[in-house]
Amino acid sequence: MIIWLAELLQPYFSFFRLFEYLSFRAIVSILTALGISLWMGPRMIKRLQMLQIGQVVRNEGPESHFSKRGTPTMGGVMILAAITITVLLWADLTNPYVWAVLAVLLGYGAVGFVDDYRKVVRKNTDGLIARWKYFWQSAIALVVAFALYAHGQDTAATQLVVPFFKDVMPQLGLMYIVLTYFVIVGTSNAVNLTDGLDGLAIMPTVLVAAGFAAIAWATGNVNFANYLHIPYIPHSSELVVVCTAMVGAGLGFLWFNTYPAQVFMGDVGALALGGALGTIAVLVRQEFVLVIMGGVFVMETLSVILQVGSYKLRGQRIFRMAPIHHHYELKGWPEPRVIVRFWIISIVLVLIGLATLKVR
């Protein structure tokens, strides 16, 4: 919106030329989203407390979590509000990639909202029935996948980029739709599984979003794309503003979500943020790098798959509890230790993921 106003006013006030620079809009995007989150936080927490919208804690979980019962949840609403407002203000709204990410963010946010509402307001511990949750996640992902394929068919936007191999970029064809579907749905659920401790999911999300901001900038710059031997995708540079909005909103939420948490994001936040990260990874053609940078999400998901598979096949559990962050809690690790160590792992993995762009 502001970039449009800047174009109108630039002939009269040269100052407005500043708003056309991507670097400037990326910085103010972080600050805007951060400011909105910090402003909304206390007000939303107070409102959630008044409405008695509190976290439901399973009796079979770690005993240390019993004290979390009743902590306000559905705080992801303020994350989505901060991101959406910021993107509408600072992004180029003629860019289709911006709308693709917003569609997934808000669509998955709606699915998560219904799930949370049923859990904490209707007191239905199961929330939204699993098959319906999966149905709506799938429907949104497939609509976006088909739209993106139609928009970028047989161009660099539908190539598969393999780390460490600069000349391996095959056209995916219709497999692009399949890959996009699994990346969006898979990342959404992976982030949701990770969201089990105070700040555990939001900080890796912020780090991965920051990593993708750098990748989007390189992918949308023909000189850097050629230098790094990655596809040049003209529309992708505008995703920098979306990524930095996610960084700012995430940091603002972390202010209230850090241990001991004053509010939890709930499924409304976790499903939406995961879906948005998956969509961004697809748009910049770095699905494999997402697996690396989002290694904490992958680890949490694999721990659940291995736990369930082992129990069904052998009747034995591999971990004391899954996802794996609960395993370490039951081993006696204090919650802050688990959280910070997972953050450190995320920092290292994001740096490794960025390094793969050059190691070819």
Swiss-Prot record:
Q: Where are the transmembrane segments?
A: 21-41, 73-93, 94-114, 132-152, 168-188, 199-219, 239-259, 263-283, 288-308, 338-358
The protein here is known as Phospho-N-acetylmuramoyl-pentapeptide-transferase
Presence of the UniProt keyword Transcription regulation in the record: no
Q: Give EC number(s), comma-separated.
A: 2.7.8.13
Species source reads Vibrio cholerae serotype O1 (strain ATCC 39315 / El Tor Inaba N16961)
Its annotated pathway reads: Cell wall biogenesis; peptidoglycan biosynthesis
Q: NCBIfam families given for it?
A: mraY
Q: Cofactor(s) for this protein?
A: Mg(2+)
Q: Name one GO biological process term.
A: cell wall organization
What keywords would UniProt list here?
Answer: Cell cycle, Cell division, Cell inner membrane, Cell membrane, Cell shape, Cell wall biogenesis/degradation, Magnesium, Membrane, Metal-binding, Peptidoglycan synthesis, Transferase, Transmembrane, Transmembrane helix
- Subcellular localization, as worded in the UniProt entry: Cell inner membrane
The record's top EC class is transferase
What's its job? Catalyzes the initial step of the lipid cycle reactions in the biosynthesis of the cell wall peptidoglycan: transfers peptidoglycan precursor phospho-MurNAc-pentapeptide from UDP-MurNAc-pentapeptide onto the lipid carrier undecaprenyl phosphate, yielding undecaprenyl-pyrophosphoryl-MurNAc-pentapeptide, known as lipid I.
